[in-house]
A protein has these predicted regions:
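Non-catalytic, low-structured ubiquitin/UBL-interacting segments
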Residues: 1-6
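Cysteine-nucleophile protease catalytic domains, especially the papain-like/related folds used
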Residues: 8-127
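Active-site signature of cysteine proteases
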Residues: 126-142, 147-260
C-alpha cells in the first residue's frame, strides 16, 4: 500500500499517481518473468530514460519507488490514474510534467506493448449502477486491477479522491454489496481500519444527493445516505499476457497453476 502523504517533496494533490503506483506494483510483480526477458533483450530501452526500481519497500517513508518517480517528474496538482498507467507503460496518455526532458518519453514497455497504445483501454466517468457492477465483475474475472475515484472521501466536499479496488462481495442478486479497497491516504484512518491495508466498505446505490435520476454506486457513510461518497471514475489495468506470450511464449502466471 502506497501512502500519498509521506513524501517530503509535496504530494497532497497526487492521489492519482499513488493509485496508479499501487496498480503498477501489482502489474510488474505478476509480469516479473516476462519483464526479465524484456530487460535481457532491451537492456537500454527506452534510451535516455531511467526506469524506477520495482522493489516495494517495507517502510512508511519510502515504500514505492514508482510513486517517487511520479513525484519527481510531475507537479503537485490533480491528474488522472488512467492517464498515468498508459503513460508509464506505453506513453499512451499524457500526465502533467515538471521535467520537460520527459516530454518525448515512449513508455517503459513500448517494445512489446507498443508506443502510444492504451494498455488501460478507457476511463469510465459517472458509471451507473449496472455499469459499475459490469466492470467490477469483468475485472475480477479477467485478472485486472481496478482504479477508482470517489467524491467526498477526503475532508468532505466534492473533490474526487483516487484509490484502488482489490476485491468485492456480492449479494443474492449478484450485485456488489461490499468492496475491498486501498486508500493511499489512509494514514488519516488508522484508528478506524486498525492498521489494515484493505478496507471493507458497504456499497449503496441511489441517485446523486438522493435527488432523482439513475442510481449511482456509492461508498456508504456511517452518517447517512446524504453523506455517501459517489464513485465518479473507474479504470482497469490488465496484465497484457497475450502480448507478452506472443513475444516470449506462454509462461505460468505467478501463484497460479494455470497459464494464460
Amino acid at each position: 500500500m502506497i501512502e500519498a502523504w509521506n513524501y517530503d517533496s509535496g504530494d497532497g494533490e497526487m492521489c492519482w499517481a499513488a493509485a496508479a503506483s499501487n496498480m503498477l506494483h501489482w502489474w510488474v510483480a505478476l509480469n516479473a518473468d516476462y519483464i526479465e526477458k524484456y530487460d535481457n533483450e532491451f537492456p537500454s530501452s527506452p534510451s535516455g530514460f531511467t526506469r524506477p526500481s520495482f522493489d516495494y519497500k517495507d517502510n512508511v517513508e519510502e515504500q514505492s519507488p514508482i510513486f517517487r518517480f511520479f513525484i519527481e517528474r510531475s507537479p503537485n496538482q490533480p491528474g488522472s490514474t488512467w492517464h498515468s498507467l498508459n503513460w508509464f507503460l506505453t506513453a499512451g496518455n499524457y500526465i502533467p510534467l515538471s521535467d520537460s526532458r520527459w516530454k518525448d518519453f515512449p513508455g517503459f514497455f513500448c517494445e512489446v506493448l507498443g508506443n502510444k497504445t492504451l494498455v488501460s483501454p478507457e476511463e469510465i466517468t459517472g458509471p451507473s449502477r449496472s455499469k459499475f457492477n459490469e466492470i467490477i465483475k469483468s475485472a475480477l474475472t479477467n485478472r485486472q486491477a481496478i482504479g477508482f475515484s470517489a467524491s467526498g472521501m477526503q475532508f468532505g466536499g466534492t473533490v474526487p479522491h483516487a484509490m484502488t479496488i482489490w476485491g468485492a462481495e456480492f449479494d443474492e442478486n449478484g450485485e456488489v454489496s461490499y468492496i475491498y479497497y486501498v486508500d493511499n491516504n489512509d494514514g488519516f484512518l488508522q484508528d478506524a481500519t486498525e492498521g489494515s491495508v484493505c478496507i471493507r466498505q458497504k456499497m449503496t446505490y441511489h441517485s446523486l444527493n438522493n435527488g432523482g435520476g439513475y442510481d449511482v454506486p456509492h461508498i456508504q457513510s456511517s452518517l447517512g445516505p446524504n453523506y455517501d461518497s459517489p464513485i465518479v471514475r473507474l479504470c482497469v489495468l490488465g496484465l497484457e499476457r497475450d502480448k507478452w506470450a506472443k513475444k516470449y511464449g506462454v509462461l505460468p502466471l505467478p501463484g497460479d497453476d494455470r497459464t494464460e
